């Protein structure tokens, strides 16, 4: 995508950012695909790891390849200071990234308009051009899963992931708590001992996260999962890991870290749909494949394709679903379904909007662990 993003560094300026988006739609012209902002409640009153994670995640979004230009919007008195954000962001293109601190100007909307005009002029110079599939980074997610998730849609995504790896592309698998009980299927495919050790540490680290909060993992699966036919955590996990296909795991990356290795990557993140999809976007995913048996409307900042595990859902929720894996239950091969999916991914990479994009459904959620001041 060739978009302009407004990234609030603190929740206090969310409404300012949203008004800027409403008031400046005339700047979306030429090859620019849209002007968007991603509100969140954080950036202040956070300590320790939470503060660091918010800073890291927002800086990663600023670097996202779908954002041709970015306005970073702050208040001025928040914990996440301008200086801290610059330190986290590192070297950046001053033509591409602009900063505005609302307390430092008389009229933040007038000042914001001027900066967004500069963003628009910068973004408008880019034109769509052909690139190989090997340049794509695709996130893989499941949510609202049902009994067919591990039979139709998830194996299709897994086969797609293998096809991407064979073509030199990159895929990202997360939802660590939904690997519990089936993690061996993944760890046995780590490309070397270093990656294996990172995978073990990631899995054990998330288990310790549950233990530190005196929580058990068996609150998963959700009521909707059970209504859809999933009975146990292991049942759900065996379906979840199907999205990883059979290719070697080339790297394991932390929350907020970028994908730097071609092939299949594992990413530290929870099962929660919004949090994990945001983490995959921050890792650099150009788009996200989201399998679902129950249905969900949400979209991440990156184009989010909904893959229905069953044909009934696709028929009932036409406004949500981009791809139907249900025909597999009637005899279509997973190979054929994966080829259909690859073609759709290429079309979306080429500019075709997902159902969530058509409706303007885009949001983020940041991983939180500690106290709020």
Model-identified regions with their sequence ranges:
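Metallocofactor- and cofactor-centric catalytic cores in central/energy metabolism, strongly enriched
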Residues: 1-287, 294-373
């Amino acid at each position: 995508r060739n978009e302009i993003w407004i990234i609030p560094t603190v929740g206090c300026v969310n409404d300012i950012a949203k008004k800027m988006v409403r008031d400046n739609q005339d700047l979306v012209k030429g090859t620019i695909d849209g002007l968007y902002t991603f509100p969140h409640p954080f950036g202040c009153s956070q300590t320790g790891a939470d503060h660091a994670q918010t800073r890291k995640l927002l800086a990663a979004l600023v670097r996202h390849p779908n954002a041709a230009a970015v306005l970073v919007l702050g208040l001025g008195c928040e914990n996440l200071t301008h200086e801290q954000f610059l330190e986290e962001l590192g070297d950046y293109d001053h033509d591409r990234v602009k900063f505005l601190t609302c307390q430092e100007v008389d009229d933040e909307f007038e000042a914001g308009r001027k900066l967004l005009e500069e963003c628009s002029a910068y973004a408008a110079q880019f034109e769509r051009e052909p690139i190989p599939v090997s340049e794509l980074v695709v996130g893989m997610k499941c949510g609202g899963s049902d009994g067919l998730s591990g039979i139709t849609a998830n194996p299709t995504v897994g086969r797609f992931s293998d096809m991407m790896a064979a073509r030199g592309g990159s895929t990202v698998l997360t939802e660590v708590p939904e690997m519990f009980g089936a993690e061996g299927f993944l760890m046995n495919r780590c490309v070397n001992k270093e990656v294996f050790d990172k995978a073990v540490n990631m899995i054990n680290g998330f288990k310790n996260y549950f233990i530190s909060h005196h929580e058990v993992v068996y609150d998963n699966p959700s009521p909707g999962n059970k209504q859809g036919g999933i009975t146990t955590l292991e049942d759900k996990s065996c379906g979840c890991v199907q999205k990883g296909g059979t290719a070697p795991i080339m790297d394991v990356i932390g929350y907020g870290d970028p994908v730097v290795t071609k092939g299949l990557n594992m990413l530290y993140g929870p099962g929660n749909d919004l949090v994990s999809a945001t983490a995959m976007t921050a890792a650099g995913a150009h788009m996200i494949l989201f399998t679902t048996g129950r249905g969900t409307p949400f979209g991440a900042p990156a184009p989010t394709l909904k893959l229905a595990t069953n044909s009934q859902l696709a028929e009932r929720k036409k406004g949500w679903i981009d791809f139907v894996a249900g025909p597999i239950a009637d005899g279509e091969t997973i190979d054929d379904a994966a080829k259909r999916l690859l073609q759709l991914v290429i079309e979306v990479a080429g500019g075709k909007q997902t159902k969530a994009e058509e409706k303007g459904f885009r949001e983020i959620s940041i991983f939180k662990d500690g106290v709020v001041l």
